[in-house]
Amino acid sequence: LVPDWLSFVKGIVDSEDLPLNVSREMLQHNNILKVMKKNITKKAIEMMEELSEDEDNYKNFYENYSKNLKLGLYEDSSNRNKLAKLLRFYTNKNPETLQSLDSYISNMKDDQKDIYYITGESKESVMDSPFVEKLNKQGIEVLFMVDAIDEYTLQQFKDYENKKLVSVTKDGLKLDEEDTKEYETLCQKIKEHLGDKIEKVQISSRIVDSPSCLVTSEFGWSANMERIMKAQALGDDNSRGYMMSKKILELNKDHKIVKELKKRIDNNENDSSTKDITTLLYDVSLLRSGFTMDDTKQFSNRICRMIELGLNLDDDDDDEHSENNVNNDTEASNEEEIAMEQVD
């Protein structure tokens, strides 16, 4: 009598006799049951709407049954807008207080057209994400969607009150116009070095403090969705490879690392350290953007090489150390021979 997402609702329905199947154990499906199911769902939503008027009591209810509401948003298209009004999210402006979508819209800037959100593993991880740096600076509110079910809900929940839901972790986010012409050579060289690891390199309009970040295509999986799908033992490898589209590396043109890298590449300094820095920048972006790293061995080797450079260590130091050991062994051997001759 109730849809799956209302499985937590318990009650008794008083009605006239209903037809049973041959075994007399189950009700036969007929129009009366459909009407009852529709009315029960309607009444349940009305009760939740009344409960939401008291935010303190509704918070306890929402903490226990938010996943059911989001499942309903995914499955029940006829009640999707009503259920969306019942959703609550933490935001970058209100990390400790749950906000409704209506509250978000009322606080939007005059020139803001879309609802921005970020998905992730936890509230703490998305708060420190490089994707919200520029939005924080501009005072734009971002919804934190940190439940695993949010990724599935967003596949059906595309807009609310004629406002599009836009992910801040995907390509296509336009905050400011950036002058990118002088960085074309830098982007091209980095793309050549990283090869098939990325689709392209571009100047970012979303990061302020971080040197770079990795974004996905608008219709591909987010980093959080990739993490969820990799954790599924029975996942389809073919569809996973299709949806895990190549990443786009975005650079912060105002960061000192990017400026120095541009200077070296413009001066044709394509030494091993520059290539290591480029690859390391990609690796760091991979981790900071929420993706998992597959080749940890190569990452560790690059870190060790950068440590050696920082300590002014190179291969010559190793050779010199080896020669000193050989000389010391020779001197010790000669001293032993002299001592034996004196004994004789």
PLM features: residue spans?
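Conserved GHKL (Bergerat-fold) ATPase module
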Residues: 1-344
